[in-house]
Amino acid sequence: MLKNIFHNCLSLLLFLSFLFSQASPEKRLDAKYYLVSYTKFKEGKKQEGMEIIQKYFWQADREINRKVLPFDFITGEWDHIVFFPLEDGTNELDWITSPVNAKLWKAMVKEIGSEDEVKRIRQQFDNCVMKSKQELAFTQY
C-alpha cells in the first residue's frame, strides 16, 4: 500500500515537472496564417455560386494580387474551401475591415461598376449558400 502511494506521488511529480517544463513561452517561427472559408451550397445552386466566385471574386483577388488557394471537394460535407492568406499574420484580425478587404472591395467596385451592384452580387451569392464557416490555420512549410 505504502509502495503504491509512493509510486503514485512519484508519477505525479514527474508529470508536473514535464508539464511545467513545457510552459515556457515559445513563438512560431516563419508561420504563415490563413483564414479558411468553407462553403456548402444549397441544392441546385452550386453552379451559380461557383460562377459568381469565378467571375467576380477570383477576378478581384487577381486584381489586388492576393494569392488565394481554392479547392473544390469531390466528397465530404463541403463544396468549396478557400485559404485566404493573412498578409499581416494574426494582426489582420484586429481590423473590422482590413486593408486587404478594403482593396478587394475597391477592385470589385471598379470591375463591376458600383457599390450597389457589388452588394447585389454579394446578396445573389449569399442566396446560393446553405451554410458556411471560417477557421484559422497556419503553416510553417
Predicted regions and their residues:
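Bacterial N-terminal signal peptides that target proteins for export
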Residues: 1-10
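Hydrophobic h-region of N-terminal signal peptides that target proteins for export
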Residues: 13-22
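Intrinsic structural disorder/low-complexity segments
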Residues: 10-11, 25
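Short S/T/G/P-rich N-terminal loop/turn motif that feeds into the first structured element of a domain
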Residues: 21-141
